[in-house]
């Protein structure tokens, strides 16, 4: 069946649309009271991810509230390292942690490469359940963390401020780091292809920590592996193109090389001006972004003003997907998200047609 709303797919292909499409990173999440209620039913965060019906429910919640142009699979970027038997757990207020770390060539060699269909079948069950529930209303976005970003969590044992263990391995034993990234690139390719086969119509690679690298290190240890993944992905499924979005937080200085990766779109955080990004790479890729999520803590008028500024910065014509520059904060007022979406719907049509 054709999609009732293919606005996002058209924008990613840089084809004309009637208004700028919008979705939000972490649009299903803790800022919504209904999410908190469902999370309470599930028990732990990973129990929520592993229950296809509940993962579907929280995926659908923001679409019931807001006129969004896509659903994004409710899951976590750390499902792959979890399937590598590193013992993922969540500390209240501290985020994800691993019971085991990977800090040597021997530890890298010992890592199993998961089979996505077998070891991450709960994710594919969620994708299938969500696609059925969506009933072709809007497209479903699947996702993964990038190899470099996954590696940082596996080496550090959780999130980090300085990434000293990851960078020590990268500079001190680059062969071991490349071996780890190679395993992860193969795993991510398999994982995203399994999501596409299960029904994901768009995929995004989240390179949350690529921006902490030097330019040569970014190209060698992050972007090269994302480009390899893009090359290995299923790009046609269910009779249509499957777009790929790459998002490196704080990666605006590398737009040209990211645009050469083979991806259809590049995600931007709020530190890169859209007009500048469009002038540099807008003839090659669509651009996604880039409202600072903290703008949503301001008044509805201030939110509207910033939406207007970003739309004007991109300018007229296709190729822009409106999003936040990072995930929506758990402390955001849902009514302020509504003000954001309403402002976009009201203001963006003048830039199209």
Swiss-Prot record:
CDD domains: URO-D (cd00717)
Pathway info: Porphyrin-containing compound metabolism; protoporphyrin-IX biosynthesis; coproporphyrinogen-III from 5-aminolevulinate: step 4/4
Site label Transition state stabilizer, positions: 76
EC category name: lyase
EC numbers on record: 4.1.1.37
PROSITE patterns: UROD_1 (PS00906), UROD_2 (PS00907)
One cellular-component annotation, GO: cytosol
Keyword Metal-binding assigned: no
InterPro entries: UROD/MetE-like_sf, Uroporphyrinogen_deCO2ase_HemE, Uroporphyrinogen_deCOase
Catalytic reaction annotation: uroporphyrinogen III + 4 H(+) = coproporphyrinogen III + 4 CO2
One GO MF term attached to the UniProt entry: uroporphyrinogen decarboxylase activity
Cellular localisation: Cytoplasm
Main location (coarse class): cytoplasm
Biological-process GO terms, alphabetical: protoporphyrinogen IX biosynthetic process from glutamate
Keyword tags: Cytoplasm, Decarboxylase, Lyase, Porphyrin biosynthesis
Similarity comment: family membership: Belongs to the uroporphyrinogen decarboxylase family.
Stated role: Catalyzes the decarboxylation of four acetate groups of uroporphyrinogen-III to yield coproporphyrinogen-III.
UniProt xrefs under HAMAP family: URO_D (MF_00218)
Quaternary structure (record): Homodimer.
Name the UniProt record assigns to this protein: Uroporphyrinogen decarboxylase
């Amino acid at each position: 069946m054709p999609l009732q709303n293919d606005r996002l797919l058209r924008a990613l292909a840089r084809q004309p649309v009637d208004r700028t499409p919008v979705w939000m990173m972490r649009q299903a999440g803790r800022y919504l009271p209904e999410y908190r209620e469902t999370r309470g039913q599930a028990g732990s965060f990973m129990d929520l991810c592993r229950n296809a019906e509940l993962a579907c429910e929280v995926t659908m919640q923001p679409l019931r509230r807001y006129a969004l142009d896509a659903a994004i699979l409710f899951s976590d970027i750390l499902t792959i390292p979890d399937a590598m038997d590193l013992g993922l757990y969540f500390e209240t207020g501290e985020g994800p942690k691993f019971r085991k770390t990977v800090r040597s060539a021997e530890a890298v060699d010992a890592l199993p490469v998961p089979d996505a269909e077998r070891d991450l079948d709960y994710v594919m069950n969620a994708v299938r359940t969500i696609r059925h529930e969506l009933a072709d209303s809007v497209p479903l976005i699947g996702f993964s963390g990038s190899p470099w970003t996954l590696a940082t969590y596996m080496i550090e044992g959780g999130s980090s401020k300085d990434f000293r263990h990851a960078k020590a391995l990268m500079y001190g034993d680059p062969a071991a780091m490349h071996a780890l990234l190679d395993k992860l690139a193969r795993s991510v390719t398999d994982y995203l292809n399994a999501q596409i086969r299960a029904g994901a119509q768009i995929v995004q690679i989240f390179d949350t920590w690529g921006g902490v690298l030097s330019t040569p290190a970014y190209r060698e240890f992050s972007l090269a592996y994302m480009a390899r993944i893009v090359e290995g992905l299923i790009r046609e499924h269910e009779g249509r193109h499957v777009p790929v979005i790459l998002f490196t937080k704080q990666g605006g200085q590398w737009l040209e090389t990211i645009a050469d990766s083979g991806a259809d779109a590049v995600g931007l955080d709020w530190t890169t001006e859209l007009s500048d990004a469009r002038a540099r790479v807008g003839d090659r890729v669509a651009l996604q972004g880039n409202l600072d999520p903290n703008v949503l803590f301001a008044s509805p008028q201030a939110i509207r003003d910033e939406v207007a500024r970003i739309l004007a910065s991109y300018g007229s014509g296709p190729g822009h997907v409106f999003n936040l520059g990072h995930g929506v904060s758990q402390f955001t007022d849902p009514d302020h998200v509504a003000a954001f979406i309403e402002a976009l719907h009201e203001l963006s049509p003048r830039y199209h047609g």
